[in-house]
Swiss-Prot record:
UniProt keyword annotations, A-Z: Endonuclease, Hydrolase, Nuclease, RNA-binding, tRNA processing
Enzyme class (EC, first level): hydrolase
Protein name: Ribonuclease P protein component
Catalytic activity: Endonucleolytic cleavage of RNA, removing 5'-extranucleotides from tRNA precursor
Family statement drawn from the similarity comment of this UniProt entry: Belongs to the RnpA family.
Record organism: Pectobacterium atrosepticum (strain SCRI 1043 / ATCC BAA-672)
GO terms assigned for molecular function: 3'-tRNA processing endoribonuclease activity; ribonuclease P activity; tRNA binding
Upper classification of the organism: Bacteria, Pseudomonadati, Pseudomonadota, Gammaproteobacteria, Enterobacterales
Coiled coil regions in record: none
Length: 119
């Protein structure tokens, strides 16, 4: 049975982890969300989230976006390549409802899977 947990080792935790992704990323994006990815040697994907107050003013909206993004990653983690992902949000993401946001994330995960050599 496949475990769908979201343990600490599936998260980017330090600034150096984020810098690693920002140096040579593969990009997949929509007008509201961009997911940067870079291959890692860990054998499993990891995710980091950046939801700037500049783009999403209200805390409950930022929390909703992060919660839905983590949940989408958790459900797709076994179909994703061994990459470090950084999710960047842009203006307008707070206007998306939960279903639209989830569908956009699923589309971006599939795009990263197509771009990766080991997926």
């Amino acid at each position: 049975m496949v475990k769908l947990a979201f343990p600490r080792e599936l998260r980017l935790l330090t600034p150096s982890h984020f810098t690693f992704v920002f140096q040579q990323p593969q990009r997949a994006g929509t007008p509201q969300i961009t997911i940067l990815g870079r291959m890692n040697s860990l054998g499993h994907p990891r995710i980091g989230l950046t939801v700037a107050k500049k783009h999403v003013k209200r805390a409950h909206e930022r929390n909703r976006i992060k919660r839905l993004t983590r949940e989408s990653f958790r459900l797709h983690q076994h179909s994703l390549p061994s990459m470090d992902f950084v999710v960047l949000v842009k203006k307008g993401v707070s206007e998306l409802d939960n279903r639209t946001l989830t569908e956009a994330l699923e589309k971006l995960w599939r795009r990263h899977c197509r771009l990766a050599p080991d997926c």
